[in-house]
Amino acid sequence: MQQIFKTTKLAILALVGWGLCFGDSARGQTYTTNVNSAIADGNPVGLVSTTTVSGLTNVISSIQVNLDITGGFNGDLYAYLLGPQGGFAVLLNRVGMSSANPFSYSDAGFNITLSSGAPDLHFYQDVTNTLGGQLTGIWAPDGRNISPGSAPNVFDTAATSANFDLFAGTIPNGDWTLFIADLGSGGGQSTLVSWGLTIVTVPEPQTWMLIAGGFGALLATRRFRK
């Protein structure tokens, strides 16, 4: 009986260890870049910030992006993310712009996480009221790969296909570039405080095998004990 208990305990400890390893992969690696730079008002040249990723051994499963932007006029901003293998996602594209709102949203700033499957960032006022302040929460990237200078009605039906799914299956190592520009004038000064990139990679096949084997060992000891 003592040997059975010892074997079961070892199997459980192994499962915990493997689970922790797998959990780290599922949580991903986060790379934060402090910028603290003004985004020139009404200037399409914009601001570029690059972070370099290295040492990841597997392809991308999913990504998230954090944006901390203060001040300005949210509806003036256009931003995109370029990956090292050519992946491209539109993060912001004149949020709020539509035939019903040709002047877009006038709230000041973002402190948000962009993640696939979350509510549409472009029409965030349909979900929440920031009372003119900084938007918070988790949102899907804008994804509208159209010119930010398009007529307001074009935004009504634009596809949201320039999203984070385009990075899945690509190699994460290399330079990731954030571009952001203020394309309106007179809306005040926006500042990019920081941005973060979280990369979740596909787990190694042996990780799944180890977890499955651990469960098998645990079940076997339980049956033997009975």
Question: What label would you give each PLM region?
Answer:
Residues 13, 171-172, 211-212:
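N-terminal hydrophobic alpha-helix used for membrane targeting or insertion
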Residues 204-222:
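A short, hydrophobic C-terminal helix/tail in secreted or cell-surface proteins
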Residues 6, 31-34, 208-211:
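Enriched but not universal
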Residues 2-12, 206:
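Bacterial N-terminal signal peptides that target proteins for export
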Residues 29-201:
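Loop and turn regions of beta-sandwich accessory domains that flank beta-strands and are enriched
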Residues 22-28:
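Sec/Tat signal peptide C-region and signal peptidase I cleavage site
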Residues 11-21, 216:
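Bacterial N-terminal signal peptides
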